[in-house]
Amino acid sequence: MEQLKVEVDPKQGGDLPSIYTLQFEELEMWLKEQGEPKFRATQIFEWLYEKRVKQFQEMTNLSKDLRAKLEKHFNLTTLKTVTKQQSSDGTIKFLFELHDGYSIETVVMRHNYGNSVCVTTQVGCRLGCTFCASTLGGLKRNLEAGEIVAQVVEAQRAMDEQGERVGSIVVMGIGEPFDNYQALMPFLKTVNHDKGLNIGARHITVSTSGVVPKIYQFADEGLQINFAISLHAPNTELRSKLMPVNRAWPLPKLMDAIRYYIDKTGRRVTFEYGLFGGENDQVEHAEELADLIKDIKCHVNLIPVNYVPERDYVRTPRDQIFAFERTLKERGVNVTIRREQGHDIDAACGQLRAKERKEETR
């Protein structure tokens, strides 16, 4: 095993690092440095991820001395809930405040097969997708791994109140996950760890807008995690208009990276395709999309987009959505239409955060 060096700066207050940032092996090493036995790591992880305590003093099978050390070195209240909204369909949306005053969003979605949580990886986003509220205001900073993990913990606490559990995770919230790769990978390892949140790899999905170098790196990780690509256009010209990231890594380079991922992992990918009225939702676009992906092991997820007041795009009519789906199916494409959720609580990425920011500046 690669040796881990744990460097923890014992500051006070909000500057303390989140305990959720530590992977299991890192916690074991920190405990060793403190003169504590390694088995304490299992006990601490149980308190964090099974019992989901909010204070170190609740970890009653630890010595008072160890609890004091934990309080001195780590922060356990990583997120502060600003608002919690529940949609008529059961979707729950959180607006969390971070220690430095920035805010992020997390969404819990109810499905027939269980509950999933959509987590955020950045405060804002630099990629500037023209249809997305997440990019309003640009990128402020990356989240730490612990700030991403804490979103899942808070979501599970909300489910605890209703006697339910979070069964899957989608990394599709605010930000580009591959722009925060250094926090993404520790997050994935902790939520998948059998002593952590213990969510199976095939119940975790990571989505990217198309940061091509990181797709190759992610493929080489050898994970069994689900992989999705925000595609949204069937040709490079239209994609560059909708998604400026395509100017850095044009569609042909993206498709090459996706083929590498499939060859390396043996897993299929999901293409997320948002339908924007009059932009990318015509039958000819569906035909072009079918040609683009005809040799790729994939699934297409059509997304009737939520209206974003700050953007100009309009919703595609229902009959046009079904025509698009039918065209793909006729050409042998595995396709579904995503069920709308949270439409009445601003559940599109970044909308709640944007609304909060707007109210603060009035």
From Swiss-Prot:
Domain of life according to the entry: Bacteria
Cofactor: how bound: Binds 1 [4Fe-4S] cluster. The cluster is coordinated with 3 cysteines and an exchangeable S-adenosyl-L-methionine.
UniProt entry keywords in alphabetical sequence: 4Fe-4S, Cytoplasm, Disulfide bond, Iron, Iron-sulfur, Metal-binding, Methyltransferase, rRNA processing, S-adenosyl-L-methionine, Transferase, tRNA processing
EC number(s) on file: 2.1.1.192
Enzyme class: transferase
CDD domains reported in the protein's UniProt record: Radical_SAM
GO molecular function, one term: tRNA binding
Cofactor(s) listed: [4Fe-4S] cluster
Localization terms from the record: Cytoplasm
Cited InterPro entries: Aldolase_TIM, Methyltransferase_A, RlmN_N, RNA_MTrfase_RlmN, rRNA_lsu_MTrfase_RlmN/Cfr, rSAM
UniProt record, GO biological process: rRNA base methylation; tRNA methylation
Keyword Signal: no
Active site positions, chain numbering: E105, C349
Family stated for the protein in its record: Belongs to the radical SAM superfamily. RlmN family.
Name this polypeptide is given: Probable dual-specificity RNA methyltransferase RlmN
